[in-house]
Amino acid sequence: MKSCHLKLAEAAFFIELFEATQERTESLTRGSDLETEASYLFSAIMNSFYSALDQWRDPATNKKGYEAFVKQNPEIYSHSHFGGWRSTTVHVGHIPITHAGYIPPKGGEVSLVFSAPPKLASTEIVEGRADLTFSPYYYVAYRGELKEVVSFARAHLHKLTVLIEFNEQSLP
């Protein structure tokens, strides 16, 4: 397995841990609160994305694809003075969770997420019953806009995985 694929798996791992902090409604460690732990995991997710993309990059074969992807995703990959999260958390300072709670989707949209619950947050499954669980969502700010972390991170992980796998298939 190529190193960039391990970094994609690492990002998925941190996203699941992040989601577990939301669903458990209690911190994972003794030394932190939920929002602090979520912000640590957010930084880890951003670093995993950056590492996967950087390890995939090859100036001889995919320079244009790399540059286009970075340009399309400035909230992660731009320099810190432009608000890039990864660069800010590594070179400037900590990125706190901006909001914990629920912000409805814009324009009457409905956001349904169907996925397996994080293993750390799993509860006993009762056959024939569906439980709706409401817990806070964590948001981070980018240029005045709040982005829900888990949805954003899952969508970005998918885009990054598609980029890497598509380009590997098209190589001779």
Where are these regions (language model features)?
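Acidic, Ser/Thr/Gly/Pro-rich intrinsically disordered interaction regions
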Residues: 1-40, 61-172
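Core of folded catalytic or high-affinity ligand/protein-binding domains
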Residues: 36, 40-55
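Glycine-enriched, solvent-exposed interface loops adjoining structured elements
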Residues: 56-60
